[in-house]
């Protein structure tokens, strides 16, 4: 089932999206730290056996990768798509008074205020033009 959102519904869904996004962002940062530690251990050139430490880091990195995949799946269950994870950018299929659109939310934004015409999701996002009530 393909879900589409009005702009109002997309903004209401942000409460849940932000919770999922916070976990994804935290996992992204932790994974990056672990990967740096792994690189440092690998390049240490010490005679001690570091295989155990490397295996432990690999296991922790894998856990973060799995959790990130789970976060993406939760967003996909809502009908949304993760365009990229840094910065976290989420596409929300939508409908406006002029037809189908793709709303675009990026980490740190307070509301859904950017979008793309359908079929132009890879292009630079554009500010949404919202008509004032009564206009």
Q: Which residues are covered by each model-predicted region?
A:
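Generic alpha-helical secondary structure signal
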Residues: 8-11, 55, 66-69
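Structured domain cores in non-transmembrane regions
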Residues: 33-65
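Weak global preference for isoleucine
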Residues: 20, 25, 61, 90-92
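Glycine-rich, aromatic-bearing surface loops/beta-hairpins
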Residues: 69-135
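A structural signal for well-ordered alpha-helices, especially hydrophobic packing surfaces
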Residues: 21, 28, 65-68, 72
């Amino acid at each position: 089932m393909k879900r589409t959102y009005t702009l109002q519904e997309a903004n209401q869904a942000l409460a849940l999206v932000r919770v999922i996004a916070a976990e994804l962002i935290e996992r992204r940062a932790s994974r990056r730290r672990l990967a740096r530690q792994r690189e440092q251990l690998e390049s240490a050139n010490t005679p001690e056996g570091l295989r155990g430490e490397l295996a432990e880091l690999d296991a922790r990195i894998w856990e973060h990768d799995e959790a990130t995949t789970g976060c993406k799946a939760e967003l996909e269950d809502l009908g949304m798509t993760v365009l990229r994870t840094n910065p976290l950018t989420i596409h929300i299929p939508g409908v406006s008074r002029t037809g189908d659109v793709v709303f675009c939310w990026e980490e740190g934004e307070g509301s859904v205020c950017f979008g793309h015409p359908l079929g132009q999701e890879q292009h630079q996002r554009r500010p949404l033009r919202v008509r004032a009530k009564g206009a």
